[in-house]
Amino acid sequence: MLIDNEFKKQLITDLTYNDQKHDYYFGSYSHFYIHEEMLKDQVRTNAYRRAIENNRDDFKDKIVLDIGSGTGILSIFAARAGAKHVYAVEFAEIAFFSREIIKKNGLENKITVLKGKMEDLVLPVPQVDIIISEWMGYFLLYESMLDSVLYARDKYLNKETGKMLPDRA
């Protein structure tokens, strides 16, 4: 593959992060273009929307945790389905934009965006009723979210009645 030097310099600049393992991965999710591509994937987005809307009874008056919330689209779906409150956890810089998106949708009192890595955060509630996450990616597990989802499940999900969406792949 041939690339010109200017493009190469820009690419290197865009991908230069400190030496921590997760920085390249999460840094790439700070750019809006990757979220735009996911939102444009109507099959994926509508599948999540329908899954939440078709299970409104499961979401009504429940505390929901959205891991890797990105733009907040799943959090918005959950809030509109009747969730009592949604905690949207996002490590990448897109978290700042998602707060604005949530505010523009009039859901800032129903959705709280928490910027940080799931494993490093302490939720303001002892447990949640539902965990939602787009943890499936390219080649099923490429997005590396499964570890964070399992951590949250073990630490925060109501052991008796808690649910996860999706719960299988």
Q: Where in the sequence are the language-model features?
A:
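Class I SAM-binding transferase module
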Residues: 1-67, 71-169
